[in-house]
């Protein structure tokens, strides 16, 4: 089963400490080695983003940042695991690394199953 994992936080948290970067690199390397990590990456800030909004008036292109955004996705991963419990455990480990290595960090790890993926394999 494939899942999309989002690391969400407020943009004013600053840069992650080197200890977190090292711990995450090690965890990501292990996940690639065991085949559970498909793709991962960090995202540029909202100031470098653009949305295309659809409403009754048509399409509107809006450059970030967006005043209504409270938490934003700062990173993502696509994982391939046996079941939802394994996906949640993977996300819990990421949250714990943030807690251990960046005590001031506040955010959320969102886990969503990817629709339409062949779960057989």
Predicted regions, residues:
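Conserved, structured core segments of small domains
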Residues: 1-121
């Amino acid at each position: 089963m494939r899942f999309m994992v989002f690391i969400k936080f407020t943009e004013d948290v600053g840069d992650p400490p080197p200890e977190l970067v090292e711990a995450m690199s090690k965890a990501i390397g292990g996940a690639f080695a065991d085949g559970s990590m498909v793709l991962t990456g960090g995202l540029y800030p909202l100031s470098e983003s653009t949305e295309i909004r659809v409403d009754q008036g048509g399409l509107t292109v809006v450059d970030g940042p967006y005043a209504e955004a409270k938490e934003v996705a700062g990173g993502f991963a696509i994982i391939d695991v046996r079941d939802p419990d394994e996906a949640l455990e993977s996300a819990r480990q990421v949250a714990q690394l943030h807690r251990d290595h960046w005590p001031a960090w506040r955010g959320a790890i969102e886990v969503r199953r990817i629709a339409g993926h062949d779960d057989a394999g």
